[in-house]
């Protein structure tokens, strides 16, 4: 069992996630077409095992899924209000969420043994990565102690209203991270209405996207910002070969 330090994520020192001096750059891969969820998880698990064994480089894999819902280890069946899309049980932390076109999913496979074996600080580092990415578009993303993910204030909706713009869910195997983050660029936000997102039913807390906030942002814009902000927290990246990680079955590119 992993023991979590009992201190706020805002106060965690995020230094220490850069790799060892002798470490290789993180491979960076972008899939051009939608990737079925089961295929992505199988490829991610395989790559993580290879990283743990020292047989593969760390990897960040950016992709989009076809419409689906995933349930984390704390997911509740009652939170699926309308099963309009397939539901996948997954080993990541958290509850129910939606994935689909227009949402940038980043699966992050890092060896925390050679960085910093601290799960809570790693989640905070992922949040900071998202916050720094949003800053490139003049969007103020914020973390909340009682709600993992990144939020934006919505005073236009009323006092105390906030919308979630990015979700985080992680799992570790032999201190190699799996799963990662999902940023809403231009998904169909109506699909979130079929679930209680992340188990949060308070009507003050909704879901938004960059386009919903009025920004003419493309997926390529977000990918470039993600890569630039990633290097400041986790270190250098290098373009991955097009055949990884899904055994040649996924069309891919690097930017």
Swiss-Prot record:
The lineage of its organism: Bacteria, Pseudomonadati, Pseudomonadota, Alphaproteobacteria, Hyphomicrobiales. Catalyzes the transfer of endogenously produced octanoic acid from octanoyl-acyl-carrier-protein onto the lipoyl domains of lipoate-dependent enzymes. Lipoyl-ACP can also act as a substrate although octanoyl-ACP is likely to be the physiological substrate. The active site is at residue 198. It is an enzyme of class 2 (transferase). It comes from Rhodopseudomonas palustris (strain BisB5). The keyword Ribonucleoprotein does not apply. GO terms for cellular component: cytoplasm. In the reaction, the free carboxyl group of octanoic acid is attached via an amide linkage to the epsilon-amino group of a specific lysine residue of lipoyl domains of lipoate-dependent enzymes. PANTHER family: LIPOYLTRANSFERASE 2, MITOCHONDRIAL-RELATED, OCTANOYLTRANSFERASE. The gene is lipB. Disulfide bonds: none annotated. The record marks 164 as: Lowers pKa of active site Cys. This is Octanoyltransferase. It comes from the Bacteria. Belongs to the LipB family. GO terms for molecular function: lipoyl(octanoyl) transferase activity. Residues 54-238 form the BPL/LPL catalytic domain.
């Amino acid at each position: 069992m992993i023991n979590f330090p009992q201190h706020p994520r805002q106060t965690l020192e995020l230094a220490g996630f850069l790799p060892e001096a002798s470490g290789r750059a993180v491979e960076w891969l972008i899939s051009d077409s939608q990737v079925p969820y089961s295929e992505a998880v199988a490829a991610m698990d395989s790559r993580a095992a290879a990283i743990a064994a020292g047989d593969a480089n760390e990897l960040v894999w950016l992709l989009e899924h076809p419409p689906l819902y995933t349930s984390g280890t704390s997911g509740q069946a009652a939170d699926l209000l309308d099963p309009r899309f397939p539901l996948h049980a997954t080993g990541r932390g958290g509850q129910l969420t939606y994935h689909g076109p227009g949402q940038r999913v980043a699966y992050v496979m890092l060896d925390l043994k050679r960085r910093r074996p601290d799960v809570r600080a790693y989640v905070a580092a992922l949040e900071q990565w998202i916050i720094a990415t949003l800053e490139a578009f003049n969007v103020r993303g914020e973390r909340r102690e009682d709600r993992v993910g990144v939020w934006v204030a919505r005073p236009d909706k009323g006092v105390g209203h906030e919308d979630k713009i990015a979700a985080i869910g992680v799992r570790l195997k032999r201190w190699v991270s799996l799963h990662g983050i999902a940023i809403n660029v231009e998904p169909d936000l109506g699909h979130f209405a079929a679930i209680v997102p992340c188990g949060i039913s308070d009507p003050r807390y909704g879901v938004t996207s960059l386009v919903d906030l009025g920004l003419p942002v493309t997926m390529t814009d977000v990918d470039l910002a993600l890569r630039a902000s990633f290097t400041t927290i986790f270190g250098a990246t290098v373009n991955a070969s097009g055949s990884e990680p899904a055994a040649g079955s996924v069309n891919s590119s690097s930017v």
